[in-house]
Amino acid sequence: MERARRLANRATLKRLLSEAKQNRKTESTSTTTTTPLPFSLSGSSSRYVSSVSNSILRGRGSKPDNNVSRRVGGFLGVGYPSQSRSISVEALKPSDTFPRRHNSATPDEQTKMAESVGFDTLDSLVDATVPKSIRLKEMKFNKFDGGLTEGQMIEHMKDLASKNKVFKSFIGMGYYNTHVPPVILRNIMENPAWYTQYTPYQAEISQGRLESLLNFQTMITDLTGLPMSNASLLDEGTAAAEAMSMCNNIQKGKKKTFIIASNCHPQTIDICQTRADGFELKVVVKDLKDIDYKSGDVCGVLVQYPGTEGEVLDYGEFIKKAHANEVKVVMASDLLALTVLKPPGEFGADIVVGSAQRFGVPMGYGGPHAAFLATSQEYKRMMPGRIIGVSVDSSGKQALRMAMQTREQHIRRDKATSNICTAQALLANMAAMYAVYHGPEGLKAIAQRVHGLAGVFALGLKKLGLEVQDLGFFDTVKVKTSNAKAIADAAIKSEINLRVVDGNTITAAFDETTTLEDVDKLFKVFAGGKPVSFTAASLAPEFQNAIPSGLVRESPYLTHPIFNTYQTEHELLRYIHRLQSKDLSLCHSMIPLGSCTMKLNATTEMMPVTWPSFTDLHPFAPTEQAQGYQEMFNNLGDLLCTITGFDSFSLQPNAGAAGEYAGLMVIRAYHLSRGDHHRNVCIIPASAHGTNPASAAMVGMKIVTIGTDAKGNINIEELKKAAEKHKDNLSAFMVTYPSTHGVYEEGIDDICKIIHDNGGQVYMDGANMNAQVGLTSPGWIGADVCHLNLHKTFCIPHGGGGPGMGPIGVKKHLAPFLPSHPVVPTGGIPAPENPQPLGSISAAPWGSALILPISYTYIAMMGSQGLTDASKIAILNANYMAKRLESYYPVLFRGVNGTVAHEFIIDLRGFKNTAGIEPEDVAKRLMDYGFHGPTMSWPVAGTLMIEPTESESKAELDRFCDALISIRKEIAEVEKGNADVHNNVLKGAPHPPSLLMADAWTKPYSREYAAFPAAWLRGAKFWPTTGRVDNVYGDRNLVCTLLPASQAVEEQAAATA
């Protein structure tokens, strides 16, 4: 055996020596042949060559070397020449560069695609597309200009994370630590099949998250005791402000005072005070005992239950008195508390708001979290935000959809109930799954444990001789002491954060992560160094209940089987994946929604979002404990200022619509500071996003609408006349650039000058910033303020309808007015001189801080050149698709040189006359091809707006174009009379398996063609799970909670009978 092994080794060695000798011989006699490598470094379309230039591989300044493969091979092992020339230092640098992973087109593809559009190079296409008058020479960063590699980025984020100090938080105030169930963390929060989905406008390919959001609504209605809920709002503070607006609308604006009880969270009070200005409402803050309605001018009142300092009060008589005076009652509440407390609906509350954060969503230094708003059926059409409803599909089977969309900004514009667009769908889904996982008994057990720990703590403090509030409480204990600050400082030394209410009052709020050991540590802190003769465990048997008997919940909740079935990890895992399989996401195919920028959400960008050093910080923790976050904020602010040409940024707005509102409020504050109280006119193009007029209305501005010319550009003459007519009262002009028509308007700098010459400020909607970065900038163009949709241009995923971020950048003269916060003072980044902040826009000082690392890592890894290239490739991809499709569909708008920006509009209006086909039919048929439809009928009715982004490969662009071309041929069959106008493959789309596999098939086309209209679908196909959903039926028969299990079964049986 040993002899055989030696012989085998000797033979191997002989062979290797022979090969080495032959290689040396080849090296000396040939300069044209190369030795193959175990990986490819050749071919102009290689992903590796495209990101590492030839000059890097051969050494800068050298002539091309056709022997790169062999030369590199000299250090790869036996069989390659060892005496070859040395490799360049550049080639030894890290290879995990990011731009080549994000920007999909290779250099060879870029050239060929540009040529197909009629240009020699990508740069010549961009030069013809972006007006020369607004082009930047270059963009350079102070930090990260060359871009970090993915590995370097992770190390940098680890360094930042190490600078955050996660102390045990007892601060409360609406933010609590929670155990995120790992099955939910891994399979929803970290799962691109959930976080890369878009808002479920296309219901047939969104049934999974629609069901989860319906679970969320059912959870909210059950716990609050009110019959209607929306599918999430941005945070508790803004939800309260929305409720205040509802009260104003319910009273038809006739009563102009809104009272807020002093037991509400300070951030909620501040947001309502800020928001009230736009509605000309007077906000009065009073102690509960001092509230009266003698003025007859009160539209509503807001109370907290439990109160911000922990008290649990009986609001029965209070609400009766309010109703007797025709005053609506808003109650801010806590979902975990409502599992054991009498629900607000049983008191008679009209509206209930709150946050679902402590249902399995980390604090994240402030967000994102899903807020909620529940109300009665009477006020359903005045509710803000998305609402999920039950309807039926074309076969009569139950199907879900977004209900009552006519309330929303994209339809009603300035008459909408709210400017809300992006909400917090991903976080609502996490919270709903938390309730599904724990069920009613599990939630009640958590609540009772939290209450018990708080009660044991209160008992212990009494034994230590401290004064504890004698009112009922749930999870927060209020303590009177001679020196609150000294106790808080002592707690910090033990890595504990408490809330200091005033010099003599301190509170401690408990949550599901609190342990008996934590309570013992608190005893030592409050004992001030004196020995403690008891433990939390020893006191436990003495505690009974601190909730007044009349306020203990008796009514059942979460009785539906969904909340009582999936309590093991296997069962919940399968339920999550069953829902996930019903939804199309970026995991399946491109989502070419115009003005939505559904680009890559890279894994490296997402990783830090789940690290405890980022997730577990309370937003009101001392900033000394969040130095990693603060460094990131400062770096990000500097990067965004460079990208936009602005002087300062606020990171507080936690949605694009919130950014619009904040920017307009900053403009308003600027005018007021100059004594221009009369400047309240806002000019808005008719083609603007619906959020623009809705936001302007919220600020109290009067809206003047101007039109566009035949080429889709803003009518400059009409704008000039409007600006001059209103020059004495002009406040702002809102503009999107490139335009919502997908064109770089040549006169944009002239437009800005017209507004400035007439005393107004220019607000730029940053929705299309993906076509500006590195090529031009809002500040360079002439804008005064702009919000950025970080969930578009800067890679925060859309999450199926949120989260998002809408930070605003401003010029120097507006910087002093950027938002602040009542608990942790904030302002612009970098900080302006002489700040005069306007108040809070969001509940947390830095908005949804937890998702800012996504945009931060994207910018830092791309570097200035990578970002510039991304903008160029986004333009290239759109023009390539427009060129491929122009022979089949008219491209509606183009720039002066015949090109489009990063998106374009195809015109389908003619097909209604020739074939009875509308954009909805095309969008539904695209589902059969495995695609999400483009943006329908906006900004022009009867059209589709397509935005490919820079992240999609040429192969994917071609696949989508092929689908649309194939659909055009299907339309032609109708036009020729070969297919029935009313019964054809487009009108019948989409075709779910339940329809295709039914016993009976009555369609005039084959099942095979309905299901597999393209060859690529046979390899892998995403299946719609329902037929076309009936929107009219859903609104006429409005049901916004889970149907009783028995009813659902009966309806499904009837539909299949």
Swiss-Prot record:
Function: The glycine cleavage system catalyzes the degradation of glycine. The P protein binds the alpha-amino group of glycine through its pyridoxal phosphate cofactor; CO(2) is released and the remaining methylamine moiety is then transferred to the lipoamide cofactor of the H protein.
The protein, known as: Glycine dehydrogenase (decarboxylating), mitochondrial
Entry cofactors: pyridoxal 5'-phosphate
Family: Belongs to the GcvP family.
Statement: the UniProt record of this protein carries the keyword Cell inner membrane: no
MF GO annotations: glycine binding; glycine dehydrogenase (decarboxylating) activity; pyridoxal phosphate binding
Coiled coil: none
In-chain residues carrying the UniProt-annotated modification N6-(pyridoxal phosphate)lysine: 792
Basic and acidic residues bias (residue ranges): 18-27
Complex formation: Homodimer. The glycine cleavage system is composed of four proteins: P, T, L and H.
EC id: 1.4.4.2
Originating organism: Pisum sativum
Induction: Induced more than 4-fold after exposure to light for 6 hours.
Single Gene Ontology BP annotation: glycine decarboxylation via glycine cleavage system
Entries under InterPro entries matching the protein: GcvP, GDC-P_C, GDC-P_N, GDC_P, PyrdxlP-dep_Trfase, PyrdxlP-dep_Trfase_major, PyrdxlP-dep_Trfase_small
Domain of life: Eukaryota
Tissue: Highly expressed in leaves. Detected in roots and embryos.
Subcellular location(s) per record: Mitochondrion
Pfam families named among the record's database cross-references: GcvP2_C, GDC-P
Keyword set, alphabetical order: Mitochondrion, Oxidoreductase, Pyridoxal phosphate, Transit peptide
CC per GO annotation: apoplast; chloroplast envelope; glycine cleavage complex; mitochondrial matrix
Catalytic activity: N(6)-[(R)-lipoyl]-L-lysyl-[glycine-cleavage complex H protein] + glycine + H(+) = N(6)-[(R)-S(8)-aminomethyldihydrolipoyl]-L-lysyl-[glycine-cleavage complex H protein] + CO2
Biased composition (Low complexity): 28-47
Annotated segments matching region Disordered: 18-47
